[in-house]
Curated annotation (Swiss-Prot):
<dbReference type="GO" id="GO:0012505">
    <property type="term" value="C:endomembrane system"/>
</dbReference>
<dbReference type="GO" id="GO:0030992">
    <property type="term" value="C:intraciliary transport particle B"/>
</dbReference>
<feature type="binding site">
    <location>
        <begin position="12"/>
        <end position="19"/>
    </location>
    <ligand>
        <name>GTP</name>
    </ligand>
</feature>
<keyword id="KW-0969">Cilium</keyword>
<dbReference type="GO" id="GO:0060271">
    <property type="term" value="P:cilium assembly"/>
</dbReference>
<keyword id="KW-0206">Cytoskeleton</keyword>
<dbReference type="Pfam" id="PF08477">
    <property type="entry name" value="Roc"/>
</dbReference>
<dbReference type="GO" id="GO:0005525">
    <property type="term" value="F:GTP binding"/>
</dbReference>
<comment type="similarity">
    <text>Belongs to the small GTPase superfamily. Rab family.</text>
</comment>
<dbReference type="GO" id="GO:0031514">
    <property type="term" value="C:motile cilium"/>
</dbReference>
<dbReference type="GO" id="GO:0005737">
    <property type="term" value="C:cytoplasm"/>
</dbReference>
<feature type="binding site">
    <location>
        <begin position="72"/>
        <end position="79"/>
    </location>
    <ligand>
        <name>GTP</name>
    </ligand>
</feature>
<comment type="function">
    <text>Required for flagellum formation.</text>
</comment>
<dbReference type="GO" id="GO:0005929">
    <property type="term" value="C:cilium"/>
</dbReference>
<dbReference type="GO" id="GO:0036064">
    <property type="term" value="C:ciliary basal body"/>
</dbReference>
<dbReference type="InterPro" id="IPR027417">
    <property type="entry name" value="P-loop_NTPase"/>
</dbReference>
<protein>
    <recommendedName>
        <fullName>Intraflagellar transport protein 22</fullName>
    </recommendedName>
</protein>
Amino acid sequence: MSDDLVKILVLGPSKSGKSTVTNFLAGTRDTPTKEYHETNPLRVLEVEIALDDTRRSGRQAAGLKKAVVQLWDVGGSSKHQAGWPAIASNADGIIYVFNPEVKGSEKELLLWYKNFALNQDELDDDNNFKMRVTDGHSLIFSHHSSLPEFAVGDNAIPPMPKQLQGIRALETSLDYQSDNFKEAFDALVEQIIASRLAAEENDLLQKEREAKDYPRLKR
């Protein structure tokens, strides 16, 4: 296999910079403008990411050179909530985006976490909603779309709600102080691919073991 498809959702409140982040990660940065355009209800952009063979070993490294990433930029309005389960289906990763200049906006990410990271149609053995997308396959972007006035320095990333504290959070911006979120995005894709290939390899090994045991069972 020469490539693989990865589906990553970009979620968060309206006017948080999701489309700007999506365009940048897809290699199509916007022309600077102060005019707001609502995403209604969804955009899907694709980008190819080169994969680092040195991060994989054995069968995992064979032939896989790139991943095709679909970035699903989901509108921040809840008026399309009825369609969210369909959007969430088969998601591999999530990027949560919020504006730290808006007080309490990080708490709004809980709505997106509960509706997309959790599968509310299935329960686990402890009677909790099953995880659709794990924390390790997610990122949080504290995104500055304009010159930061309040959220700077140690306050750039406010404390996350308890349910989101296991997700890596970064300070992001295209024009102001920012962590290297493109590098974090590439690493996220690598992690998703590595987890997928490890699961496929384990499944193949299990089938090989079962095939070896089958003649013994017949005797």
